[in-house]
């Protein structure tokens, strides 16, 4: 079987195995289903555009995903895609996630323009890109990794990659498409590296790598992967000229890599602040943190080797922390590290110490070179997720294993092909077919889990029953659908796992508010405010605290307790003052104060509160809320009998918008009052 046929077969198998992913909905990070809703301009005071409150993962989410991302679904300037993060928030914003993937957003935007806001076109785009990625992976194996591209081994590696169940999160979710798109250009960069000579060849490799990075940050690792594999092949070949050329290429690629990395770091205005809820291992005690990180690396390797148990989220209590260095998990992690180091050392010795490949004859490829190449593909793209330089916002994320899985498939395919060569002829095909059938069955089943929010979160609960976040996700979905009893049970189950989780108190407060159980809602919101000291130190937490004061005041106002409500709104204003990240909460706090003061007949103070809301909203570009606050101030001035001041503000609105119907109506009302 030729290389082109192996590429086509791998792509075809990938399309067949992931065909049922085309019927999936928008789920998980594709959209938010939490009670907070998404940022939007409103005509009445509502929860602010900043927080996003409890998203599908039960966390405070200060970002938008595909469905709510204005850079995808609105006609924002194309330049905004290069100024905003992946979720549509400006990089300069203190609440930006700092994930910079403008080409992924551009791809989603193109799909939206062509197919509308339906999940099918988005899934189809990712599905097609996955087939291309699988074909390119086979080509990388044929042209870059293997000196002797035996057709059977080539096809086996390609099918292992095409059928790997850990790819489901990247292929079956729309947001995960960033990984798939990036992999296409990652493989193109690696493909170009062996022949790269001179400025033009280096520029081509670097261009592909930069494009990959603009789809997903890990894409830039194509440069070190390509350089490392080229050096390995040169060392195994034993030709001095190739080694010298490889060293020169590696040095040039390293310089470009560092320059691009410096530019990317320069784009980051700040690093996001995470908590133990997102990445528990990063907050383990100092003496145990390294052990926990080492175990997390081993856990990721287990997902690649044995992808039987998969989950859309591995945060919180999914992976219990190592509490003693003498724990079996810690010892197993250390043993695995030593074993990996020994295998790498032996492979390196095989590359450097054995007869060059060119003198061995056909089929006598340097096994150590192939194994080390697989290690490079597995480890280097995983480095950004290893918490080495900065803390990342997750413990384990299956989608970031997409590129590292290529290395595992190279190693596994090579070893399995060698073992099959020693097996009886009548047993080879059945054994390999059985393994591939197992992978295909797991992949098809996992795609079904990604079809809807209910099936996805239900599978996550089965896989990680101690992760309170997945209970919160499913509870949020049920609350959105109006199944409040189911949602309440899930939120309480989450609280049983993590009693101090302020997010669950908040979600229960929203649920009780929807039911009209105001006493229970007030108690839940107060519980949320009292249980979040750890989170309150972050930007997100400060916004959330201000929002909670506003929510508490809203409930108190509905309960007929205006004085208590005013105290809560004052607390919201105090918590939000002077912080650009909390401008929307500050506007809401002033507007709510104005509404309560108006209800008490204190119209002068009510007008002052609404005018304060107007000034803050105007200063921060919240134009819809600014206009609403101005009209509320005018109404209060009219009620206070300050007609001249009211007319002055109406005339200012009419000068800016002569056709404003509401201003005309207020002007007519003033005239009638004057005639009376």
Language model features: what each stretch is:
Residues 462, 493-496, 529-530, 537, ...:
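Conserved structural position within tetratricopeptide repeats
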Residues 471-478, 490, 504-515, 524, ...:
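TPR/Sel1-like alpha-solenoid repeat signature
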Residues 1-519, 526-533, 544-546, 551, ...:
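Polytopic membrane enzymes that build or remodel cell-surface glycoconjugates and lipids
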Residues 468-469, 502-503, 536, 546, ...:
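Helix-start (N-cap) detector for alpha-helical repeat units in TPR-like alpha-solenoids
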Residues 645-676:
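Terminal, low-structured helical/coil segments at or just beyond the last alpha-helical repeat
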